[in-house]
Regions:
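C-terminal catalytic core of tyrosine-transesterase DNA break-rejoin enzymes
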Residues: 159, 207, 211-218, 299, ...
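N-terminal DNA-binding recognition helix of tyrosine site-specific recombinases/integrases
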Residues: 7, 11, 98-102, 109-122, ...
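Active-site/catalytic core of tyrosine-dependent DNA strand-transfer enzymes
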Residues: 28, 186-187, 239-242, 265-314
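Basic, Lys/Arg- and aromatic-enriched nucleic-acid-binding interface segment
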Residues: 136-140, 144-146, 159-165, 169-223, ...
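N-terminal DNA-binding module of tyrosine recombinases/phage integrases
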Residues: 15-122, 275-284
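Short functional hotspots where side chains directly engage DNA or cofactors
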Residues: 169-170, 231-236, 317, 328, ...
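C-terminal secondary-structure termini that scaffold catalytic or DNA-interacting sites
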Residues: 1-3, 194, 231, 244-270, ...
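Catalytic-site neighborhood detector that most strongly recognizes the C-terminal catalytic loop/helix
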Residues: 42, 175, 183, 240-242, ...
Length: 381
């Protein structure tokens, strides 16, 4: 049997066309045969420089035969074997969409071991300028999400000896741009509350949202078993998702901290208690036509848009109702740690970072109070 050649071992030769060619061992097949990486150059000196860089790059590499598969083939495997079993269906659908529309059309046919950081960087620039196969430039946030998917997939490729290094480690990501939040001020919030009074079907839904700041899926997924009228609490145990192609599925809360018990304001306890007396469904907010099913998250979003327009209020995302609740809670004196628990944030620091526009105002107000106190103290002294 031929001796197994170690990785990094190589050879140099001059080809018939006059160019110099070199190769190094970068792995082995199942039968023990070597897997080579080839480089070529016009001169022997140039070749040796290239070869030296390759030896450094592939130092300690032990690639398998699968290193010859394309990036597209690997993405299919990673999505099926790694992503699908470990993430929520909605997240998995998003991953598949990014792969099919933004990665595979441009880099999918390239051998995975030959995908470079330059290839990935070019892809990201193209997506920002022109978009994927659907057309339309993609936002920095979307490109960063696509990067997250590709980065995860290629990390596993490194672990499985398909590539030596993750090429996405060496790319520059578009600058993160935080989307502007639309917060209803006191007068606007009053108008919104007046608007929902005219909608018997949706009033309770939006009242609960404004007084708890629940995520849309959490709100739609509430059941009567989650409500304790005596204690005045609401337990958030699940979240509802729209299923692609129609229907819904019930999943876990977004994070571990998302599973929480919220102390409700007395007015909200009274509202839910009265609602429960006439309810015929296990869901707090059932589908009006099929009460055995919950109301769909998209329905709440659509109705909110109409209510805002009818009330002459600024257009906003459903999530901005959550921001509105949080902003008014902070300005009313609720401390950040308590608010973090109500919102289901994993860390209080995230709450503080998210609502810096509020905490900044609170700090300025506090400094003014301290300043007045110190001025009085100095004068009295």
């Amino acid at each position: 049997m031929a001796k197994r050649r170690p990785s990094g071992d190589g050879m140099v030769r001059k080809r018939d066309d006059g160019r110099w060619e070199g190769r190094i061992v970068v792995g082995h097949k199942e039968n023990g045969d070597s897997i080579f990486h080839y480089v070529s150059a016009k001169t022997q000196k140039a070749l040796m420089e290239k070869l030296h860089r390759c030896i450094v790059e592939y130092d300690g590499a032990e690639l398998t035969e699968d290193c010859r598969m394309t990036l597209g083939e690997w993405l299919d495997i990673w999505l099926r074997e790694c992503a699908e079993p470990s993430v929520r269906p909605s997240t998995y659908a998003g991953y598949c969409g990014y792969a099919e529309r933004s990665i595979k059309p441009f880099l999918g046919s390239k051998q995975i071991s030959k995908v470079t950081a330059a290839d990935v960087q070019t892809l990201y620039r193209k997506l920002q300028r022109e978009g994927g196969v659907d057309g339309g430039a993609l936002s920095p946030a979307t490109v960063r999400r696509i990067h997250g998917v590709l980065h995860q997939a290629l990390n596993v490729a490194v672990d499985r000896h398909l590539i030596v290094k993750n090429p996405t480690d060496d790319v520059t990501l578009p600058k993160k741009v935080t989307a502007a939040k639309t917060i209803l001020n006191d007068k606007q919030l009053e108008r919104f509350m007046e608007a929902i009074k005219t909608d018997e079907h949706w009033h309770d839904f939006f009242y609960l949202e404004i007084t708890t700041g629940l995520r849309r899926g959490e709100l739609c997924g509430l059941m009567w078993t989650d409500f304790d009228a005596e204690k005045g609490t609401l337990t958030v145990r699940r979240t509802l998702h729209n299923k692609e192609g129609g229907g819904y599925y019930v999943g876990e809360t977004k994070t571990g901290a998302g599973r929480r018990i919220i102390k409700l304001p007395p007015s909200t306890v009274q509202l839910l208690s009265e609602r429960k007396r006439t309810s015929i469904s296990q869901w707090i907010f059932p589908n009006p036509i099929h009460p055995e099913d919950p109301i769909m998250p998209n329905s709440g979003y659509t109705r909110m848009k109409k209510l805002l327009a009818e009330a002459g209020l600024p257009d906003m995302r459903f999530h901005d109702l959550r921001h509105t609740f949080a902003t008014h809670a902070l300005t009313s004196g609720v401390d950040a740690k308590t608010l973090s628990g109500i919102l289901g944030h994993t860390k209080t620091s995230f709450t503080l970072d998210t609502y810096t526009h509020v905490t900044g105002d609170m700090h300025r107000k506090a400094s003014g109070i301290v300043g007045e106190f110190m001025s009085d103290f100095v004068v009295k002294g």
